[in-house]
Amino acid sequence: MTEVVPRTVLYCGVCTLPPEYCEFGGAFKRCKAWLEDNDQELFAQLYSVEALTNAVQASSISAEKQEEIDRKLQKQQQKDEAKAERELLKKLASKVVIKRIERSKRKRIISVSGLEVFELDLKKLSKTFSSKFATGASVTKTADGKEEIVIQGDVGDGVEELITQMLKEKGLNQVKVEQIDEKKKKKE
């Protein structure tokens, strides 16, 4: 019996699709530049002048329709790139708020809000907090519909360090992480 050798497939470093499908994604220009840097042969096979003229001749679409399709595709790609840039600016403009809330006597809880913008799984993050700090941690909804992580105990400094480290790993160094003390008003 002959041994079957698995095929190796190259995936784009930008959109994670095979390079043949990059043109259908939102970041075609960046994908094309990545392919040119990483695999010259495949780039020449897909995007050389000969390959493009052969593709146009093989298709039954008229030149005018092809130009219209190209224009629409380019417009869509520009919209997608602008959207990605807006999302990045939104992430950089947002801030993470760590509140230290006094409960009774010497008991405190830490409330972490503003993390939903960064597309983090808050349940996994609360599990990480509870195992790292050996306390209870849960995800709750606030009055305005956003989610926050509530951690039992006074571990605000450790939470701040962990969050800044996680944001640095994602390449978001400019995000503000601030701590706020919220004290209960005494009854008179």
Curated annotation (Swiss-Prot):
Keywords: Cytoplasm, Ribonucleoprotein, Ribosomal protein. It is found in: Cytoplasm. Residues 96-167 form the SUI1 domain. GO terms for molecular function: translation initiation factor activity. It comes from the Eukaryota. InterPro entries: DENR/SUI1_TIF (IPR050318), DENR_C (IPR046447), DENR_eukaryotes (IPR005873), DENR_N (IPR048517), SUI1 (IPR001950), SUI1_dom_sf (IPR036877). The SUI1 domain may be involved in RNA binding. Belongs to the DENR family. Interacts with the 40S ribosomal subunit. This is Translation machinery-associated protein 22. The gene is TMA22.
